[in-house]
Amino acid sequence: MDILFSLFISMAMFTFGIIGILIKRNALIVFMCVELMLNAANLLFVAFAAHWGNETGLIWVFFVLVVAAAEAAVGLAIIINMFRSKQVVDVDQYNLLRG
């Protein structure tokens, strides 16, 4: 696989993630766009690791996946608490983070 193709796909995924974060107001959609951006970075790590024949990129992918799993657990817990407290997951309506 050509490195430019992988770079283009990764760049497109990352761009779609940024656009989704800037346009959408649903907290779950924003969360999924952040995960899309992390997967774009993982694709880039794998592409460069395959291109250069170095396994370091694959190790970084493993660490990014571990961090993404922890982020998913914390992020979904926050979204569930947002819905339980005010019955909305719209980030515009839920802008005050008070105890």
Swiss-Prot record:
GO terms for molecular function: NADH:ubiquinone reductase (non-electrogenic) activity; quinone binding. It is a multi-pass membrane protein. Its EC number is 7.1.1.-. GO terms for biological process: ATP synthesis coupled electron transport. It is an enzyme of class 7 (translocase). Pfam families: Oxidored_q2 (PF00420). The chain crosses the membrane at residues 3-23, 28-48, 59-79. It is found in: Cell inner membrane. Keywords: Cell inner membrane, Cell membrane, Membrane, NAD, Quinone, Translocase, Transmembrane, Transmembrane helix, Transport, Ubiquinone. One of its GO terms (cellular component) is NADH dehydrogenase complex. It catalyses: a quinone + NADH + 5 H(+)(in) = a quinol + NAD(+) + 4 H(+)(out). NDH-1 is composed of 14 different subunits. Subunits NuoA, H, J, K, L, M, N constitute the membrane sector of the complex. Belongs to the complex I subunit 4L family. NDH-1 shuttles electrons from NADH, via FMN and iron-sulfur (Fe-S) centers, to quinones in the respiratory chain. The immediate electron acceptor for the enzyme in this species is believed to be ubiquinone. Couples the redox reaction to proton translocation (for every two electrons transferred, four hydrogen ions are translocated across the cytoplasmic membrane), and thus conserves the redox energy in a proton gradient. This is NADH-quinone oxidoreductase subunit K. It comes from Protochlamydia amoebophila (strain UWE25).
